[in-house]
Amino acid sequence: MIEANQILAKMKNQKINYDKVLRKIISQWERDGERPKILLHSCCAPCSTYTLEFLTQYADIAIYFANPNIHPKSEYLRRAKVQEQFVNDFNNKTGASVKYIEAEYEPHKFMKMAKDKGLTEEPEGGLRCTACFEMRLEIVAKAALEHGYDYFGSAITLSPKKNAQLINELGMDVQNIYNVKYLPSDFKKNKGYERSIEMCNDYNIFRQCYCGCVFAAMKQGIDFKQINKDAQAFLQQF
């Protein structure tokens, strides 16, 4: 199966459009009659909306909800449940067979990483975010390798607030460490983000007000008592 490096090698000395890279990879799958298995990291249901609508045309997808950065635990559980609900609703509506896998909640690993690297005071979008992206990409790469997926990737590139160039560069670096192929993407391209908003409305999906990181949330002035109260109220429905 084709690796992104085979395409990227032909694109030296130019800014890389990772959406075009993804589409070239997909075209090769179609020429070869392949339908790969992809383990796709998702930070939240909204980021997985258009991403699944697009990718399920060409591949078998499992959503991997692995986000040790999310605080508090009740908010993690709420986002996980919303993600699981969306996968089920999407499958029922489209006839797809997307799998949902939820990682163990391990916030201590994120906290230790941020403190050990001296990143707790970094602004959102700074070095702490880079380390967080890399940490989660490594988690999904390890799981993809362990469970025999052809590719690993992330739905985070749907967000206009996240640096897709950086995320893809990190993904390619992680690919070089683990023996599993990274699937590059920039899902917000071609009106992907706009389509995600439409799908959130269609599926009545909860859209969170902060990324999840406790350090960024404190600087943002997030009211954790209210977040916890709202999350607990949501979870009591199940």
From Swiss-Prot:
Coiled coil: none annotated. Disulfide bonds join C211-C213. Its EC number is 1.17.99.6. GO terms for molecular function: 4 iron, 4 sulfur cluster binding; epoxyqueuosine reductase activity; metal ion binding. It is an enzyme of class 1 (oxidoreductase). The keyword rRNA processing does not apply. [4Fe-4S] cluster binds at C43, C44, C129, C132. InterPro entries: QueH. GO terms for biological process: queuosine biosynthetic process; tRNA modification. Pathway: tRNA modification; tRNA-queuosine biosynthesis. Keywords: 4Fe-4S, Disulfide bond, Iron, Iron-sulfur, Metal-binding, Oxidoreductase, Queuosine biosynthesis, Redox-active center, tRNA processing. Belongs to the QueH family. Catalyzes the conversion of epoxyqueuosine (oQ) to queuosine (Q), which is a hypermodified base found in the wobble positions of tRNA(Asp), tRNA(Asn), tRNA(His) and tRNA(Tyr). PANTHER family: EPOXYQUEUOSINE REDUCTASE QUEH. This is Epoxyqueuosine reductase QueH. It comes from Staphylococcus epidermidis (strain ATCC 12228 / FDA PCI 1200). The gene is queH.
